[in-house]
Amino acid sequence: MTKLSRIPLIAMFSCFCVTLSVAQNSENKKPNIILVMTDDLGWGDTGFNGNKKVITPNIDMLASKGAILDRFYSASAVCSPTRASVMTGRNPYRTDVPHANQGHLKEGEITIAEILKEQGYATGHFGKWHLGTLTKKSRDGNRGGKPKNLQHYTIPTSHGYDEYFCSESKVPTYDPMIRPATFEKGESLHFGWKSVDEKKSTKKFGSAYWVGNEKIDTTNLDGDDSRILMDRIIPFIRRSVNQKKPFFTTVWFHTPHLPVVSDKAHRERYSSLNLREQIYFGTITAMDEQMGRLWLMLESLNIDEETIIMFCSDNGPEKKTPGSASIFRQRKRSLYEGGVRVPAFAIWKGHIKGGQRLEFPSVTSDYLPTILDILNIEFPDKRPIDGESIWPVLTENKKLRDQPIGFLFANKQSWVNNQYKLISVDDGKSFELYDLLNDKSEKENIINKEPEIASVMKQDLKKWIQSVTNSKMGKDYNY
């Protein structure tokens, strides 16, 4: 029995009727869906957002084919929670994944992969997982194999994926199974990481690529990590096409998360820059090449017009790296704009007009309701969903968001609507208010100038936090 089979009959019957209407209409062929997420890529780390140093011609080309989302947010200021929001359409605190390396994606959550698998999609996950451990038997990544973490074991096939090739958490961006060589040798960045002696450069990093229950892949793991991932993604897509099945895949690159490692060829493309920039930008360019490879493959299979690609990052750039948040305040682990406003675009040839730059506030929690809207599918039950469909934004230029975006991280909380942002960095003891339409860099706190706006937003935030708390306690689950 699948999770979806436990959903109340009336909801399932509603979805079944919608499914029949879609399947019977030949003009509504189900699109392929690729959700790409980079790791710690800052808003200002791509050419399409104005970076003059980084070389990202393929990502920029893809962005130009669709809508660039200037005001797109990660649901959290760090990795794991944002990923939970993509999977569920819910704020990560609802799912009890509040921080990196905490919690896991619970059985009671309904994921986008599960819903699409029920709709006949082939489903695959590639890259970082970070939503639980991938082994009970061996030490792996940050948490895998430790007795205290056995409760957090949950693999992608438990959440709707047919297949996967993924790591529990971070890996080096080049030679991902090997500890990086010393910073002095120019082969890795030393941003808080202990460098190792050259003679120890072949020591294992301590992570594996998992492909099944207690099963790892040990082949083709040398070189650029983004290329290693794409070597698995392309065959998955080809198999799906050959089987005449629409496909859904989450492509979660590790780049440019620490430890950032780049090969000589990519470093040399930035020879005029300092070593740290050579390595950081080099690994981004290596990832960009794989995005170009992905697009060429879609074109060669004549499915580029049948495929939706949504691209974003999981949070802002890491501190003390060459990563850029552009004009936005602070970086990763902050709920100010630089920590959660991330580069993003959406493309679907023939459906989303190219060359757009949209200021509509959107968030990673919007992915699930947007995809369901495109497919004309209802969510299977009535649990709270924080995201909303941005399909009318992408196709009809809708201007205003229906519901604000709430954020919770550590001792920070924030409430963002179409114009204003209410934020606290001390668990709600004090607040600041910013007009994001006129002050994108959050330089002027206007809470004393707009007390009525702040008061209403505080009340709404308080109600939302209570709803989130109820969900976190498991009140949304049917078991």
Regions found by a protein language model. Name each.
Residues T2-P8, F13-S14, V22-E432, L436-Y479:
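Formylglycine-dependent sulfatase
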